[in-house]
Amino acid sequence: MRKVRVLALVHDHLVPPDDTTGIDVLEAEWKMEYDVIETLREQGHEVRVLGVHDDLAGIRPTAGFFQPHIVLNLMEAFAGITTFDQNVVSYLELLRLRYTGCNPRGLILARDKALSKKLLAYHRIAVPDFTVVRYGRKPVLPKKMQFPLIVKSLFFEASAGISQASVVENAEQLARRVQFIHESLGTAAIVEQFIDGRELYVGVLGNERLEVLPVWEMSFAKMPENRWRIATERVKWSTRYQKANGIMTDAAHLDASAIAHIHRMAKRAYRALDLNGYARIDLRLDEQGRAYVLEANPNPNLAYGEDFAESAEVYGLSYEKLLERILTLGLRWEPERTG
């Protein structure tokens, strides 16, 4: 692609340092931002970084003098509030700035795990049975829901608040875990039928025409038999815990028909939730071979070596080409023509 000016919007505490001498970048919390920004620079693109926390005022003047062709949106929250991420993108649209990633409507639909499941179910895409427990309320289960269940935040991503205790097997455990979500994360809780099986991820790229990346699987080779095989916060973010339990991700070993079915589900979910740019669809595959969509993540981790980039590599997109594909999709997206 042609060389472009890129304004990278990142959380202010995740702005990579200019000099990384003596720093273990692999363990840095800003690794994704560093990987993306430096790779684009190495490709010849001019990248300016702007850290944002609770004020969007800096975007307009910076865009005014820098004149970016596109904004690289790496924001996942605003002022620490995850449900405000769509407002950042809405502001970019009002400024008539091209941007990478998902549109505001898709962010809203995907962020709410209950609303997204209702939409998916309407489109006859299999999802686990669920109920929502609003903040401060006690759980009341529909008759069709049976233990074990899994309790999550209605809005948070990145496995926030998920641990082995999230899978509950009786009413007492359920009440305790719902209270934990309410008090520790300050959000409503979603209680889902627990799907015992394989943890799968599918990356999707595109606006109208979609490309589906290879099905990826999280495996738990050394996990004790009495532990639930789920993507907890420790599983996702603790390298020590990953090594101790043989947790890794790689291309899923499935037959061609299963892969084709899961790919179709991922594409249908992507379209049903009005996503664009790129996203990851999370699924579970039960012991009978039935796949269920758990949720969609419209801003997956783009760090080098992470699931999305690794599956793109297997698909035939190098890390450099993946990032340029994401830029190209953002440049081609026309928000005023949607709906």
Predicted regions and their residues:
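Hydrophobic beta-strand scaffold residues
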Residues: 47, 98-99, 127, 149, ...
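Active-site nucleotide/adenylate-binding loops and adjacent lid/helix of ATP-dependent enzymes
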Residues: 1-10, 64-67, 107-198, 209
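ATP-binding N-terminal substructure of ATP-dependent carboxylate-amine bond-forming enzymes
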Residues: 1-100, 104-105, 109-111, 122, ...
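ATP-dependent carboxylate activation and anion-phosphoryl transfer catalytic cores
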Residues: 119-121, 253-339
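A short beta-strand motif that forms the metal-chelation/ATP-contact edge
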Residues: 6-7, 72, 201-206, 289-304
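Phosphate-binding site of ATP-dependent enzymes
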Residues: 171-264, 287-292
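Short acidic, glycine/proline-rich loop/turn micro-motifs
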Residues: 17-22, 160-163, 306-309
